[in-house]
UniProtKB/Swiss-Prot annotation:
Annotated organism of origin: Ruminiclostridium cellulolyticum (strain ATCC 35319 / DSM 5812 / JCM 6584 / H10)
Gene3D superfamilies with a match to the protein in the record: 1.10.1420.10, DNA repair protein MutS, domain I, MutS, connector domain, P-loop containing nucleotide triphosphate hydrolases
Gene for this chain: mutS
Record lineage: Bacteria, Bacillati, Bacillota, Clostridia, Eubacteriales
UniProt key word Membrane: no
Protein name from the UniProt record: DNA mismatch repair protein MutS
UniProt keyword DNA damage present: yes
Length: 873
């Protein structure tokens, strides 16, 4: 067995340190992969798998990609959940003694992508760290491209459920966990399946409290005292920073603030409610179009787009903060011309947050700096527009805007207006910025002028009419003469290269000027790069000022976007208060009215409080608009609490601390849960975690099981909710159990509502208007007909329904008036049970073959039927 070559041994030594990564190993102009990495990469990237002699008996499997095109291949691997370690040559091959030194300069993972072209510009790319200690969890999240860093802890209640809810809020691309969480196979599997995210363990020592505090204290310095208050969030935060340091291997100074928060500081939205309300994407297509974000996002900048998404995902519960936003939106809505001008200026602002991330992380180029300069040029005009505003929020934003003239001027005088992408080939520094660069450029230019003059003089001197002076990287400058003029070549010409149709020569004089030109150009390239690094570092020193300004621009952008939507769509300013009353007049669903003919959308009122209008029971057929109505109420409340105007004539919103929705049902095949089990799990979560200030939106509770079981559960849930000692919160409750409408007047705080329907022959027209009272029928067969069910099935359904009518089962399903009470509660089931027993006895009578009965048989059957009737009563 052979011994591997020195180069391959170097590869294996580095690969040993990065076992969980695909190693991109730089060899000349290519990144090469070997052995199992090569086999994996060739399959995933669909590139050719070859081999390379490595000193062993068999050739090493190998594949590679050009270094200049590597970003695209790295992006494809990372998008599939792989980590990629970038191994570069860290010394000049010309100066190397033996094997060129190589080392990993960066590890690219799903959560640490810094290449903006690989990311959604309007969405944060979060890396999350989760630390588990018993039933407690510490969380930390960071977007490395912007420097946003957040941390919290989960130490009470259903901590597992709250953890999943926080993950649903951030939707991280990658999660690192400690060993205790990793050993919880059920939880880690659920996280991977539900959120389609990359989960891996990280060194346990980095999760230890002492080590984490040291890491955080070293990075955040003066903020350490505040950090200590968040105990197990410290463990997660320290590990997160350590992971970034170990993968990025660069300065992380753009992560400037430790933003700690408690879950209760914002409206709580569980994962199910976020999904059901389609806040940022639709349930089916996972598309932005059709979501609330799609309606509200008229932002002009990427920064504003990301901030608006965050506002929607994290509504406020502080009345004062909400009022500040609403007042700002109102003034921007009213000042139409100023808003238009401000938005036009914002359109010219690039993604300052991510550009500054590139500055600090070392991936910025000159075109990025020009984009930064052009963005800063808009700030004085935007600041001037804000001077006349009265809204406190806007005035604060104006004060935060720093015109950054010094930074803008630095880039203006130093970087050419249209620079190349690369920063290592010169041609990026303006004339007049640096005397040495100017001097070297003059030498280079003069040398090239001399070359041009030489060509003319040599033609005249030799008589070679097509003589020319050329250049290539291998031979440098040369004099080229074609075959037809070989006889005229002077003796002092030194032959350098022979080609099929010509020969190339040099002269001592040409070689001397070549040294001058090339020496100057090489020095220019080195000097320009050094100057670029110096300029970049000067800009990085102003990071705090620039980030603060970028944040203010993003806030103005979001407020202006909300004002624009309010103006275009005819939204009203909601009156948000600390009361318990929700009163929406002529409310509309913000998305549905946008997706359909606006003039055809039927507005509806909503009244909820914690007294007489605690719980609204809503009945009506499928497709009539119950779900739309309930969702629109939840969305209007949420919109009000992010500081947005709302689609209604008027709206009074008593603050809501959390919104829970139970809408629709489907089997959770991944966890082996049936539709009914999923439904009951969601109901349990709601009843356990809801408070008196919560808003519940419940649709078809109990429909996943038998009629009597479902009715029993729905009834019990209503009892629990309306009971002030147990819950007593504001609730919309849609149901097909018409028997539940009898609860109005029997239990406190319940009101019946229904969707109006117009019958036209055997057809129905859904009027989509909510009115007081219970529905007259479910219209199931008519809905089936509208859905396109074959006519033969419709006809058979009518026949069966008619037979059931004969069996004395009320066709409409409408509850009969109940006089009897059992233990102080309504006997809602007695009548339904009686009807079911009657139907069974009638069916037995139908099956009797009278022609074959003896008198004794007849008497026995009659006796048995009588016994059943007596037992029924």
């Amino acid at each position: 067995m052979g011994t591997v070559t020195p180069m391959m041994q170097q590869y294996l030594d580095i690969k040993e340190q990065y076992k969980d990564c695909i190693l991109f190993f730089r060899l000349g102009d290519f990144y090469e992969m070997f052995f199992s990495d090569a086999e994996l990469a060739s399959r995933e990237l669909e590139i050719t798998l070859t081999g390379r002699d490595c000193g062993l008996e068999e050739r090493a499997p190998m594949c590679g990609v050009p270094f200049h095109a590597a970003d695209n291949y790295i992006a494809r691997l990372v998008s599939k959940g792989y980590k990629v370690a970038i191994c570069e040559q860290v010394e000049d091959p010309a100066l190397a003694k033996g094997i060129v030194k190589r080392d990993v300069v960066k590890v690219v993972t799903p959560g640490t992508v810094t290449d903006i072209t690989m990311l959604d510009e309007r969405k944060n790319n979060y890396l999350m760290s989760v630390y588990k200690n018993g039933n407690f969890y510490g969380l930390a999240s960071v977007d490395i491209t912007t420097g946003d860093f957040y941390a919290t802890r989960i130490t009470w209640g259903n901590t597992r459920g709250k953890l999943l809810d926080e993950i649903a809020k951030y939707l991280p691309s990658e999660i690192i966990v400690n060993n205790e969480l990793n050993s919880d196979n059920e939880l880690t599997s659920e996280i991977k399946q539900r959120f389609n995210t990359y989960v891996s363990t990280f060194e346990e020592t980095s999760f230890e409290y002492g080590n984490s505090m040291d890491i955080l204290a070293n990075h955040f310095e003066k903020q350490t005292l505040n950090i200590q208050e968040y105990d197990i969030a410290v463990n997660a935060s320290g590990a997160l920073l350590k992971y970034l340091e170990s993968t990025q291997k660069v300065n992380l100074s753009h992560i400037q603030k430790f933003n700690s928060y408690a879950l209760e500081e914002y409206m709580i939205l569980d994962a199910s409610s976020r999904r059901n309300l389609e806040l940022t994407e639709t349930m089916r297509e996972k598309s932005k179009k059709g979501s609330l974000l799609w309606v509200l996002d008229k932002t002009m900048t990427s920064m504003g787009g990301r901030l608006l998404r965050k506002w929607i995902e994290q509504p406020l519960i502080n009345h004062g903060d909400i009022s500040l936003r609403l007042d700002a939106v109102e003034e921007l809505k009213n000042k139409f011309m100023v808003r238009v001008e401000a938005r036009e200026l914002l359109k010219r602002v690039y993604d300052i947050e991510r550009l500054m991330g590139k500055v600090v992380l070392g991936s910025v180029n000159c075109r990025d700096l020009i984009a930064l300069k052009n963005s800063m040029c808009q700030i004085p005009y935007i600041k001037s527009l804000l001077n006349g505003f009265e809204a406190e929020y806007i005035k604060n934003c104006g004060e935060q805007l720093d015109c950054l003239e010094d930074v803008c001027n630095l880039i203006e005088v130093s970087i050419i207006d249209e620079p190349p992408v690369t920063i290592k080939e010169g041609g990026i520094i303006k004339d007049g910025y640096n005397p040495e660069v100017d001097k070297l450029r003059m030498a280079s230019i003069q040398g090239k002028d001399w070359i041009a003059a030489l060509e003319a003089s040599q033609r005249e001197k030799t008589g070679i009419k097509n003589l020319k002076v050329g250049f290539n990287r291998v031979f440098g400058y040369y004099i080229e003469v074609t075959k037809s003029y070989f006889s005229l070549v002077p003796e002092e010409y030194i032959r350098k290269q022979t080609l099929s149709n010509c020969e190339r020569y040099i002269t001592p004089e040409l070689k001397e000027i070549e040294d001058t030109i090339l020496g100057a150009e090489e020095k220019i390239i080195q000097l320009e790069y050094s100057l670029f690094v110096e300029i970049k570092e000067k800009i990085a020193e102003q990071l705090s000022r620039i980030k603060s300004t970028a944040r203010a621009l993003a806030e103005i952008d979001v407020l202006a976007s909300l004002a624009e939507v309010a103006d275009r769509e005819g939204y009203c300013k909601p009156e948000v208060s600390l009361s318990d009353k929700i009163e929406i007049i002529e409310g509309r669903h913000p998305v549905v009215e946008k997706m359909t003919d606006k003039s055809g959308f039927v507005p509806n009122d909503t009244v909820l409080d914690m007294e007489e209008d605690r719980l609204a029971i809503i009945t009506g057929p499928n497709m009539a608009g119950k779900s739309t109505y309930m969702r629109q109420t939840a969305l209007i409340v949420l919109m009000a609490q992010i500081g947005s105007f709302v689609p209604a004539a008027t709206a009074k919103i008593g603050l809501v601390d959390r919104i829970f929705t139970r809408v629709g049902a489907s089997d959770d095949l991944a966890s082996g849960q049936s539709t009914f089990m999923v439904e009951m799990s969601e109901v349990a979560n709601i009843l356990i975690n809801a408070t008196k200030r919560s808003l519940l939106v419940l649709d078809e509770i109990g429909r996943g099981t038998s009629t009597f079981d479902g009715l029993s559960i729905a009834w019990a849930v209503i009892e629990y909710i309306v009971n002030k000692e147990q819950l007593g919160c504001r609730t919309l409750f849609a149901t097909h159990y018409h028997e539940l409408t009898e609860l109005e007047g029997k239990l406190p705080g319940i009101k019946n509502y229904c969707i109006t329907v117009k019958e036209k022959g055997e057809d129905v027209i859904f009027l989509r208007k909510i009115i007081r009272g219970g529905a007259d029928g479910s219209y199931g067969i008519q809905v089936a007909k509208l859905a396109g069910v074959p006519q033969s099935v419709i006809d058979r359904a009518k026949e069966i329904l008619s037979n059931l009518d004969d069996a004395d089962i009320n066709r409409s399903g409408k509850a009969r008036r109940i006089k009897k009470q059992v233990d102080g509660q309504l006997d809602l089931f007695a009548q339904a049970a009686k009807a079911s027993a009657d139907a069974e006895i009638l069916e037995e009578i139908r099956k009797i073959d009278i022609s074959r009965l003896t008198p004794i048989d007849s008497m026995n059957i009659l006796y048995e039927l009588q016994r059943k009737m007596n037992n029924r009563e």
